[in-house]
Amino acid sequence: MTEHFRLSFNARRILATLRARGPRSRAEIARLLDITPSTVTRLTGALIEDGLLGEAADPAREGQKGFPAKLLTIEPGGVITAGVYIDPDRIMTCLSDLAGRVLSEETLPVPDRSFVAMMTVAGDSVSHQVEALGYARRRLAGCGVSYPGQYSEDPTRVMRIRQFKDWPSVNVARDLSPYFGMPVYHMNDAKAACLAELYHGACIGVRNFCHIWLSYGIGGAAVVDQRPYLGRNNGAAEWGGLFPKTQPRPSGQDLLDTLGAAGLPLDKLSDIEDRHLTLPVVAAWRERAAAQLQWLCLVIARTYAPEAIIIGGTLNPLIIEGFLETIRAAPQLGEDYVTTPPRILRAARDNRPQLGAAALPIHQLMNPTAYAGQAVKGL
């Protein structure tokens, strides 16, 4: 993060509160966060000066006598972030603001699947969009980059998926930044997509939820008290490990392999069209995969007990919607599960997975859990 956006712990708490709860007065913020009104006034004054907050009249006090109370609001254009999503089929980039509004975007073909080629295309795309929109560099909080792969014991490295087998051993803290000319933050595709739902999508204000991401593989993420829970080595909620690759599993690659074994070889998930969905082999796969995902939802409900489970990904949308219909229609989530189950939600932002990556710099800026310094009273 640039020096301009090095925010204190309590400044982050103020931004996080306004994001989750909407416009609030200074007095309300002081009560909610248990900090002094003078501290709130000082911190919010600096945030307004930096362009991160704005003020609006309180409609509840309209027409009343005395000095009208002002509500603090997040200023969407105060910060611009870049997002890059890379999968074996395409490269998707965007610029977005604090409200998650996409200001510009591109979807680009994969030139070849080499690391250098894909990152070069992504970096050039981001650079062109920044120049075209004419934003001041001081407003760019950074670029988020996401691509598939489980985390290894080294948190700076993710395991290579089959389609990226020729990539070098990438150090995400070192090897991505040269392509983008700004601070770069990495998270794998599933966990970045979860941030898009947390900050801009179906789970704004949902305190505890889990995310299931269905692409070539099966990924996921967990959010506890509105904060991503990553666990040891960023390995929390990696649901794919519950479905061994030597066995049938509810993944996009498994569907492609199933089609190939039936004499219908397809190279990419984007090659699966609506007309394929009625084929008997696909119908059987969907039925089996839906049962597996219902079992996964039961495991999540028993272990995390979240308010909601959100399902999304890059599989054909009709396949994902079919999974949700099956799980929601089940009389019980599982045997002896007699309490109210978590809500099963459709992801709202998986059509723009690059927006999840663009949320990474916002997370670094706004979320108190990302604060690397020491919390000091009054700051």
Task: For each feature predicted by the language model, list its residue ranges.
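Short glycine-rich anion-binding loops that position phosphate/pyrophosphate groups of nucleotides
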Residues: 148-151, 215-217, 315-316
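Hydrophobic alpha-helical segments, especially N-terminal targeting/anchoring helices
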Residues: 96, 151-152, 222, 230
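Short glycine-aspartate micro-motif
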Residues: 71, 81-85, 140-144, 209-213
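Glycine-rich phosphate-binding loop and adjoining helix at the ATP-binding site
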Residues: 29, 102-133, 137-208, 320-333
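Glycine/GP-enriched mid-protein hinge/lid loop-to-helix segment characteristic of carbohydrate kinases
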Residues: 105-107, 114-118, 167-168, 172-190, ...
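ATP-binding/phosphotransfer module of carbohydrate and carboxylate kinases, centering on a glycine-rich
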Residues: 1-59, 64-107, 113-131, 135-136, ...
